[in-house]
Amino acid sequence: MSRNSYIQQSSDIQAAGGLVPMVIEQSARGERAYDIYSRLLKERVIFLVGPVEDYMANLVVAQLLFLEAENPDKDIHLYINSPGGSVTAGMSIYDTMQFIKPDVSTICIGQACSMGAFLLAAGAKGKRHCLPNSRVMIHQPLGGFQGQATDIEIHAQEILNIKARLNELLAYHTGQDLETIKRDTERDNFMSASRAAEYGLIDSVYDKRQLAS
């Protein structure tokens, strides 16, 4: 399988034996085999699955940019099932989502925690969704550093700066006031899909796909 087709399968799919389903597409030129993720990418579907880290973030960013180049006026659908992860990796995805022209619709399947929840909320307004049994969790950023006392102080201040910035952005995307966000992210704050909708992290809970008439 090609490097580009590895999308977000990483450790979860490797644990299942590394097997990725293949689909056969018929065309006038004959048959062509795709791994399932590459085939869904043709439908403008991207998967963000597993811990958010640099390699996975680069793949997501590359796919967002590719789909924008293909059609800058058609929505992109980002499916999220993530426990969170690196803030810097997550922010590279966030900034790209805001930068590109197409709306990015976000859909939580399973869980969207920490940076996963942040990216879920960062989707286009009116196009952020959860499936009914998904869970969402927000909290303050985690960090740890060893070294000289002065360096520890520098890193501690940087974590506080990151926390403040994430709170500001979360307040913007949810419509909550900043003080509410500060209070609610002080500890791990788990929400059901319906509670996430009430809070403003998403716009609706999907029970069934709405088919075009």
From Swiss-Prot:
Domain of life: Bacteria
Record GO biological process: protein quality control for misfolded or incompletely synthesized proteins
InterPro entries linked to this entry: ClpP, ClpP/crotonase-like_dom_sf, ClpP/TepA, ClpP_His_AS, ClpP_Ser_AS
Active site positions: 114, 139
Localization: Cytoplasm
Coarse class of the protein's main subcellular location: cytoplasm
An annotated Gene Ontology molecular function: ATPase binding
EC number per UniProt: 3.4.21.92
Keyword Flavoprotein in annotation: no
Enzyme class of the recorded protein, top EC level: hydrolase
Subunit note: Fourteen ClpP subunits assemble into 2 heptameric rings which stack back to back to give a disk-like structure with a central cavity, resembling the structure of eukaryotic proteasomes.
Described purpose of this protein according to its UniProt entry: Cleaves peptides in various proteins in a process that requires ATP hydrolysis. Has a chymotrypsin-like activity. Plays a major role in the degradation of misfolded proteins.
Record family assignment: Belongs to the peptidase S14 family.
Protein's UniProt name: ATP-dependent Clp protease proteolytic subunit
High-level lineage: Bacteria, Pseudomonadati, Pseudomonadota, Gammaproteobacteria, Pseudomonadales
Gene: clpP
